Amino acid sequence: MTFYERTVDLGLKAYKTTLSPFIGRQCRYLPTCSEYAAQALKDHGPLKGSWLAVGRICRCNPLGGSGYDPPPPPKTPRKWKCEE
């Protein structure tokens, strides 16, 4: 885990243990935004995972949607075939 991934993971854990119990469940989606962010970081790395998490947080509002919205699956790298 890189320094950035550890920092974001620590921030998510701090949010879940300190603020989340007092605020209550506010997220309109499943998995919650913090769970989505953790999974996106794990699957896509720090740069794309953060971008996906920010997009999800922006969608989580009264005018946005609701329901089941998991992070997209990671893309498998293309395998180039050399024909001889």
UniProtKB/Swiss-Prot annotation:
UniProt subcellular location: Cell inner membrane
Its chief place of residence is membrane
Location of region: Disordered: 63-84
Membrane topology annotation = Peripheral membrane protein
Pfam families hit by this protein: YidD (PF01809)
Entry superkingdom? Bacteria
Record keywords: Cell inner membrane, Cell membrane, Membrane
Chain segments annotated as coiled-coil in the UniProt record: none
Write down any Gene Ontology CC term: plasma membrane
Q: What does this protein do?
A: Could be involved in insertion of integral membrane proteins into the membrane.
Q: Which family does it belong to?
A: Belongs to the UPF0161 family.
What NCBIfam families does the annotation carry? membrane protein insertion efficiency factor YidD (TIGR00278)
Q: Return the protein name.
A: Putative membrane protein insertion efficiency factor
